[in-house]
A protein has these predicted regions:
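Primarily single-stranded nucleic-acid-binding OB-fold modules
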Residues: 17-19, 46, 106
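Extended, charge-rich, solvent-exposed interface segments
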Residues: 1-34
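Conserved hydrophobic/aromatic pocket- or pore-lining residues that grip, position, or stack substrates
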Residues: 56
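Short helix-to-loop capping/linker segments positioned immediately adjacent to catalytic or ligand/cofactor-binding
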Residues: 6-11, 43-47, 61-69
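Divalent metal-dependent catalytic cores for phosphoryl transfer on phosphate-bearing substrates
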Residues: 40, 51, 62-170
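A generic short-segment signal for beta-strand/edge and adjacent turn/coil regions
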Residues: 24-25, 46-47, 123-124
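Pre-Walker A segment
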Residues: 29-44, 64
Length: 172
């Protein structure tokens, strides 16, 4: 419900549809909302993956106020889905699957997004290409300078969310 409330004000219907297409698939959405984000590092409780992902999306929005609105929403959605591959690389208890031992969760995540990206391309080709560019940078950040500098915010927001959760757990 929190993700739906966060996404509701998005003025880009094709982007909202993209998120619903991804998270509406039971094989993706169910684990996304119930799995931990990690086994023991951060957000390691049931539902931690969705909590962490939404924190990243919100932080990205807060960090990108000087950029055009469409770039902010595209990057925030990429932040929301940056760890989506964990639904294939982790088990409900946070241990890695055999696939997760072989392939990064970032790459598995992009693989999961491809069908929805293809549908997004039919209604908003520039948006689909922007997401491809952002996820390309997320998968291999040291390989290139991002054409969309907002992509760098995902990495920072990811670390901030993880560190903040560790701080909460340490001092609670």
């Amino acid at each position: 419900r929190a993700v739906e409330q966060w996404l509701q004000p998005c003025p880009y219907e094709p982007l909202k549809s993209f998120v619903y297409q991804v998270l509406g698939q039971p094989s993706i959405g169910c684990p996304f909302f119930t799995y931990p984000a990690s086994a023991s590092y951060h957000h390691c409780c049931s539902g931690g993956l969705a909590q962490h992902s939404l924190e990243v999306a919100k932080t990205v929005q807060g960090m990108t106020t000087c950029f055009p609105e469409h770039e902010r929403w595209l990057t925030a959605v990429a932040g929301l889905l940056h760890d989506i591959g964990k639904v294939r690389s982790f088990l409900p208890d946070g241990r890695r699957t055999s696939t997760g031992c072989l392939v990064s969760h970032e790459l598995l995540g992009f693989e999961l997004l491809v069908p929805a990206l293809m549908r997004l391309e039919a209604t908003w080709a520039d948006g689909a290409n922007a997401l491809r560019n952002i996820f390309d940078w997320v998968i291999r950040p040291k390989q290139q300078r991002p054409l969309m500098p907002v992509a760098m915010c995902i990495q920072q927001a990811d670390m901030m969310s993880a560190y903040a959760d560790n701080r909460r757990r340490t001092f609670s």
